[in-house]
Amino acid sequence: MKLNDKELSKIVGGNRWGDTVLSAASGAGTGIKACKSFGPWGMAICGVGGAAIGGYFGYTHN
């Protein structure tokens, strides 16, 4: 089965909490990558901070 452009434009899914989780995971990954040079503790702190920021924006964008 193939979907055309019209059908693809009408796909709706997810919710606020799902967006929050995905954004938090993405923010954590970005934070960890950004702070690799600061060692494991720096990566942990940046990962938590990135998750908090990503989760906040994922939750409030709706």
From Swiss-Prot:
The keyword Heme does not apply. Pfam families: Bacteriocin_IIc (PF10439). Coiled coil: none annotated. Keywords: Antibiotic, Antimicrobial, Bacteriocin. One of its GO terms (biological process) is defense response to bacterium. Residues 1-14 form a propeptide. It comes from the Bacteria. Belongs to the bacteriocin class IIB family. This bacteriocin depends upon the complementation of two peptides for activity: LafA and LafX. Associated with a 180 kDa bacteriocin complex. Heat stable bacteriocin active against Enterococcus faecalis and other Lactobacilli. This is Bacteriocin lactacin-F subunit LafX. It comes from Lactobacillus johnsonii (strain CNCM I-12250 / La1 / NCC 533).
